[in-house]
Swiss-Prot record:
HAMAP family: DXP_reductoisom
Protein name: 1-deoxy-D-xylulose 5-phosphate reductoisomerase
EC number: 1.1.1.267
Encoding gene per record: dxr
Entry keyword annotation includes Manganese: yes
This protein's pathway: Isoprenoid biosynthesis; isopentenyl diphosphate biosynthesis via DXP pathway; isopentenyl diphosphate from 1-deoxy-D-xylulose 5-phosphate: step 1/6
Organism: Herminiimonas arsenicoxydans
Gene Ontology BP terms: isopentenyl diphosphate biosynthetic process, methylerythritol 4-phosphate pathway involved in terpenoid biosynthetic process
A single MF term (Gene Ontology): 1-deoxy-D-xylulose-5-phosphate reductoisomerase activity
Annotated residues for binding of 1-deoxy-D-xylulose 5-phosphate: 125, 151-152, 184, 207, 220, 225-226, 229
NCBIfam families from the UniProt entry: Dxr (TIGR00243), PRK05447.1-1 (NF003938), PRK12464.1 (NF009114)
Length: 391
């Protein structure tokens, strides 16, 4: 029996994780659930899964949740705040942590889980983008297990040699030529370039293949999401930027590929449903039912691939630039993107202003060495303040 903490349980990844948990009550028990402010949804989850602890973002939200839980006769302990997130992520009663809090807010509890030696199901890509070396050092020092949840990185993990994370060898020594990171292209893959400045919020969050939250849906539309995944792949698999190739694949059936020096290319295919990588990571090295139907290749009939157009998707180039610059550059880029995307969702800037704002912030704040978590948070704060001042 694994005891699991789900950071961000009311988001799309959290809901999918609980769906898998519900299918296997003999394998998994929920230790803690967390949400920022979706109190009613969290209370309903507590009623179904009976966690030991529930964490929300504020004292006000905690009071509301406590009233709801008392009305249901539940004994779940209610906590709030950032420190409580780190506590439930590192608690001795917890074996496994689903890190699914969106954005920089997920960094501290993910690091806490790593330092406590937990099995981490990493859906929060910003943790690696902001502090890749720090997180990987914490994992190595504690013996934590890091399992990627992003469909692309989970696919790469499945296509890697079984001994890849057990042997201290370079990708080349494992015979790996490069990683092929697939991308759907989002809702604007074929839209006229001169109309992108007219994109509405509703259009940007309407992803053609995946059901996701608003922020990540916009990131997919700009392909910043894929840029973040390039940086994540670099840290997860130790592959340099020039060996990570992004390929547009509109059908979203091939989730990523690994190319080997003997000419072989291994790919992982499946329906676009996050329960597949979640179930894989939760049960690894076993396999369990995820509730996802297998793909029907005859029905799909055709799989297509193309190179990304960097004029259409300048955020992808910004991410490669940040990875090459190293240091605090990825954290600066990530923070600027979060501010820009929220400004777009709030109707304060246009769609094409997102990449322009990020580029301005990156130019204004040159990269500096990242030595500890406080440095990361300071660079994150500076980038957010700078981005806000440019709006």
């Amino acid at each position: 029996m694994q005891h699991i903490t789900i950071l961000g349980s009311t988001g799309s990844i959290g809901v999918s994780t609980l769906d898998v948990v519900a299918r296997h009550p003999d394998r998994y028990r929920v230790h803690a659930l967390t949400a920022q402010n979706k109190v009613e949804e969290l209370a309903a989850q507590c009623a179904q899964f009976h966690p030991d602890v529930a964490v929300v973002g504020s004292a006000e939200a905690a009071q509301k949740l406590q009233v709801l839980l008392n009305g249901m006769g539940l004994q779940t302990q209610v906590e709030y705040g950032a420190a409580a997130l780190c506590t439930v992520a590192s608690a001795p009663e917890c074996d496994c942590v689903m890190a699914a809090i969106v954005g920089g807010a997920g960094l501290a509890p993910t690091l806490a889980a790593a330092r406590a030696g937990k099995k981490i199901l990493l859906a929060n890509k910003e943790a690696l983008v902001m502090s890749g070396p720090l997180l990987m050092e914490a994992v190595a020092a504690s013996g934590a297990i890091l399992m990627p949840i992003d469909s692309e990185h989970n696919a790469i993990f499945q296509c890697m040699p079984a001994t890849y994370h057990q042997q201290q060898l370079t990708p080349a020594q494992h015979g790996i030529e490069k990683i092929l990171l697939t991308a759907s292209g989002g809702p604007f893959l074929n839209r006229a370039l001169d109309t992108l400045d007219q994109v509405t919020c509703a259009e940007a969050i309407a992803h053609p293949k995946w059901v996701m939250g608003r922020k990540i849906s916009v990131d997919s539309a700009t392909m910043m999401n894929k840029g973040l995944e390039v940086i994540e792949a670099h840290w997860l698999f130790g592959v340099p930027a020039d060996r990570i190739e992004v390929v547009i694949h509109p059908q979203s059936v091939v989730h990523s590929m690994v190319s080997y020096i003997d000419g072989s290319v291994l790919a992982q295919l499946g329906n676009p449903d996050m329960r597949t990588p979640i179930a894989h990571a939760m049960a690894y090295p076993e396999r369990i039912d995820s509730g996802v139907a297998p793909i029907d290749l005859i029905k799909i009939a055709q799989l297509t691939f193309e190179h990304p157009d960097l004029l259409r998707f300048p955020c992808l180039k910004l991410a490669y630039d940040a990875l090459q610059a190293g240091g605090s550059a990825p954290a600066i880029m990530n923070a600027a993107n979060e501010i820009a995307v929220q400004a777009f969702l709030d109707g304060r800037i246009g769609f094409r202003a997102i990449d322009q704002l990020i580029a301005r912030v990156m130019a204004a704040l040159p990269s500096s060495p990242v030595t500890d978590i406080d440095t990361v948070f300071e660079q994150d704060r500076r980038a957010r303040d700078t981005a806000a001042s440019f709006i």
